[in-house]
Amino acid sequence: MPGAPKTPAARLVADCDAWDGYPAHKHELLAYLREHGIHNVVAITGDLHAFQCGVVRDDPDPATGVPAIVDFVCAGISSASFYSYLKAAWKGTPLASMVATPARLDSFLMANNPDLCHADHDAQGYASATVTPERFSVTFNKVKPLNPDGTAPADALLGRTRLSVSRDSVEVQVEHI
């Protein structure tokens, strides 16, 4: 993978509790959508400890696969970030440079996944969705981590990002608000 450090015969599984952890089920769902001409499908999930948004293709190869679902993934508000888990796990390994900063990890993942249109792996927060006949929008609300004494910061909101997809489209508009 371009930009990834060389590791001696190492294999890394970052997350099996996602689409790629269930290839048969993913294939069955995407085939059903394609065969029945079902469009305007979105998924909004969590449990990755990060904010992400991208398209899921009926075939994972971007050259041949057709986008079938727009997938919105929300960070948890009270759990550690995906970035923090990787930083701790990769400390002292050839992969440590990949998590030198949160921006390094996010830019690497986006550069190597053309279907990922938003990534923030160093995040805690929550999401809200607005659904109309013409548009599906999700606002990711990133909050500051708890203070060292376990209390919430006085001004907890760190940032907001709105991601929107219009009816009959899989193109996601990203707006930092």
What are these regions (language model features)?
Residues M1-I177:
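Long, structured stretches of catalytic cores involved in phosphate-ester chemistry, encompassing
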